[in-house]
Regions:
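Active-site-lining helix/loop region of Rossmann-like oxidoreductase modules
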Residues: 2-125, 136, 150, 155
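C-terminal helical cap and adjacent loop that interface with cofactors, partners, or active-site loops
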Residues: 118-172
């Protein structure tokens, strides 16, 4: 539906109040800023694999990338937030904002942004392609991750059973 893609941006915003307690804790809800960054340093906060997803996205779009960067920052509660597994007081961490970028010679080619926080505004998924023509897809509310994973497995099963032995990626 389009020509060559020059840049891709994917944004996902999730209101963690609608998700299981384990995810709420994984994004740092209820922590202080210091506690949040301590767990970041230990690799215990954030979405695992976002940089790898950026690399896979670049590969699938035919973009040559030679460097990848990632940033993880807290989202703070601007007011007390109730709902979910616990109450988050104003000023505490409500969740996280994580960004992964794929670069080609210093130029950003793919940007993935993930915000998961209690009370996050306007949950949803947005996909934007800088191509000819430009494409923007908005999914209000977003696609629930657990359900999407189950659908991916079911839809991949016929191709997996018909494939040759060996390691495959989602691109194959």
């Amino acid at each position: 539906v389009c020509g060559a893609v020059h840049h891709a941006k994917v944004s996902r915003t999730v209101d963690a109040r609608t998700r299981r307690e384990a995810l709420q804790r994984k994004v740092g809800a209820g922590l202080s800023e210091d506690e949040f960054f301590k767990l970041v340093d230990q690799g215990r906060i954030g979405h695992v694999g976002l940089v790898e997803s950026a690399a896979l996205c670049a590969l699938g779009l035919g973009l040559d990338c030679d460097d990848y960067e990632e940033e993880l920052t807290p989202v703070f509660a601007e007011e007390e937030i109730t709902g979910g597994a616990f109450t988050v007081k104003k000023g505490q961490v409500a969740g996280m904002h994580q960004v992964a970028v794929a670069l080609d010679d210093g130029q950003e080619r793919v940007r993935l942004e993930l915000t998961i926080a209690l009370g996050a505004d306007e949950p949803g998924d947005v996909i934007e392609l800088d191509a000819d023509p430009k494409i923007k897809v908005v999914i209000p509310g977003g696609i629930p991750g657990d359900r999407a994973t189950a659908h991916l497995v079911v839809n991949a099963a016929p191709r997996m059973t018909a494939s040759e032995p060996g390691l495959l990626t989602v691109l194959e």
